[in-house]
Amino acid sequence: MRLDKYLAETAQCTRSEAKTLLQKGRVTVNGAVCKKGDTQLKDSDTVAVDGQPLAYQQFVYLMLNKPDGVVSASTDKRDTTVVDLIGDAYPRRELFPAGRLDKTSTGFVLLTDDGGFAHDILAPKRHVSKTYTVTLDTPLTEEMRQGFAEGVTLADGTALSPAEVSALSEDGLVVRVVLKQGVYHQIKRMFGVYGAGVNGLHRDAIGGLELDKTLAPGQWRELTAAEVAEITTK
C-alpha cells in the first residue's frame, strides 16, 4: 500500500492532508522521516506521525446504543440517522448499520464498513441471534410462547422461523424475545397475530455480544476483535 493512502486510512485524513504531513516531515517509516507519498509499505513497516505509531484497520466495527427517534440508515433527508451520531470520527469510512431498528426502538445497532461481515450476521442461514426486551400492552400467554416456538405465521401468510419468548416481569408485560431472522416490523407483527401490541422494544444483544451497559443512549464505541468474534458465536 502507498504511504499516502495508508495515512489517509489510519490517520483519518484526506490525501491532501496526508501530503501536508509528509511535506512537513511529521511522518516516519521505521523511525526515518519519509516525505514521499508513493512509498510502498511492507507489512512489517512501522509508520508514525509525530512519533505516534499508526495501526492499520481494514474495517471498523462500532457498537451504538440507538436512542428513540433516530432512524437506522446512513442518510436521511428528514431524520437524524445512526451514522449522524458518529459525527466526523471516521471521515474516510462509509459506515452503515448492519441490520435495522425501527425509529421508535432503542438499543444495540452495529455500524461497520465491512459488507461481508454484515451479510454474514444478517443471512438467515447463519442463524445469528438478536435478543430484545419488549414491553407489551397485554400479558404474555402460553399460546404466544407455543406459537413463537413453533414459528408464527403472519397475517400476510409469511411463515417465520421458530423464536424464543419468555417473561421478564411477574405481570408478563415485559418479555425477552430471541430471533434468528429479520423481517420488517417482525416482533410487532408476531405479537399482533395474538392481538398484543408492542409499547417498547430494546435490542440487548447481537449474537453472543451484549450491549455495553455503560453506553448512554446516543453513545458508541469501537469493538475489539474478540467482541466482533463474539457476535457470531450465538
Predicted feature locations:
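Basic, flexible Lys/Arg- and Gly-enriched helix-loop patches that mediate nucleic-acid binding at interfaces
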Residues: 1-234
